Structure formats: C-alpha cells, structure tokens
From Swiss-Prot:
Highest classification ranks of the organism: Bacteria, Pseudomonadati, Pseudomonadota, Gammaproteobacteria, Enterobacterales
Cellular localisation: Cell inner membrane
This protein's name: Probable succinate transporter subunit YjjB
InterPro entries, A to Z: ThrE_2 (IPR024528), ThrE_Dicarb/AminoAcid_Exp (IPR050539), YjjB (IPR020914)
Similarity-based family: Belongs to the ThrE exporter (TC 2.A.79) family.
Ranges annotated as spanning the membrane: 8-28, 55-75, 87-107, 129-149
GO biological process: succinate transport
The entry's keywords: Cell inner membrane, Cell membrane, Membrane, Transmembrane, Transmembrane helix, Transport
Length: 157
C-alpha cells in the first residue's frame, strides 16, 4: 500500500468517524457552536488510533493513546471556549467504541445458551468480550487521566 493510498484511507476514516461524533453530540444536546469541534476531535481521535494501529500497536493501546489525546485536546478547548471538557470529548470517543467485538461476544453468548456449550464458541465469546472490555476500559481511563494530570492542585512529588 502506497503512501497516497494510506493517506486517502486515513482521510476517509477521519471523515467517516466525524459523522457519528456529530450525531451523538446532537443526541447529547451539545451547543451548536461546539458541533464542528466535536466532529474535528472525533476525526482526530479515530485518525490517531488508525495511525498507531498501522504503526504496529494493537487496538487496545492505540485506543488508550487516542483517548488520551482526545481528553487532552478537549480540556484545552474547554478552556478556550468556556465549556465543560465533556462537551467535546464524550461524543468524540463514541466512534472508537468496539461495536463489532461486543456484538460478536453477545451473539456467541446467545448461541451458547441456545445450542449448548462448545469450546470454539466459548473461545470466540471470551476473546471478543475481553477485547471489547479492554477497549472500553482504555477509552474511559484515557479520558479520565488528562483531567487528573491537568487539574491537579497539589505538587506531583
């Protein structure tokens, strides 16, 4: 894959991830003036995750680093635009939620309950459940840590 193809894929990924970020921002009743910034932050988060995954990181660590980036930028933008950081960050990380892994784990659990236990189905269930749980944990910790770092009142040492 050439560099042009990679950049086009990255741009496509960023544009397509900005759409659900704006959609969820509208569901969460974000002010209209903040909607473009939610879209930009969602695109930056998903694009940075794609960059890290293409550099060789796994999806869990890439998601953690991308959510750290989203949280840090969201805190800075909240200072500039006098809004709460969650206005920008929560809708921006929604496109990074692990829908396919969670869905596959859920379908595997339903199949096990209907058809009975089988080892391959249990492996599929556990693999996808742990992957989805790790990604959701990475998103929540990655969004929390910048606030803990940047709003700290006491000295670090």
């Amino acid at each position: 894959m050439g560099i042009i193809d990679f950049l086009l894929a990255l741009m496509q990924d960023m544009i397509l991830s900005a759409i659900p970020a704006v959609g969820f921002a509208m569901v969460f009743n974000v002010p209209h003036r903040a909607l473009p910034w939610c879209a930009l932050l969602g695109a930056l988060g998903h694009g940075s995750r794609m960059l890290m995954m293409s550099a060789g990181f796994n999806i869990e660590w890439s998601t953690f680093m991308a959510s750290l980036l989203v949280g840090s930028i969201g805190i800075q933008w909240s200072r500039w635009y006098l809004a709460h950081p969650k206005v920008f960050t929560v809708a921006a990380v929604i496109p990074m939620f692990p829908g396919i892994s969670a869905y596959t784990a859920m379908i595997s659990a339903v199949k096990i309950s209907h058809l009975g236990y089988s080892e391959p189905m249990m492996i599929t269930l556990l693999t996808n459940f742990l992957k989805a749980s790790s990604i959701v944990g990475a998103l929540s910790i990655g969004l929390s840590v910048p606030g803990l770092w940047l709003y700290r009142k006491r000295p670090r040492v």
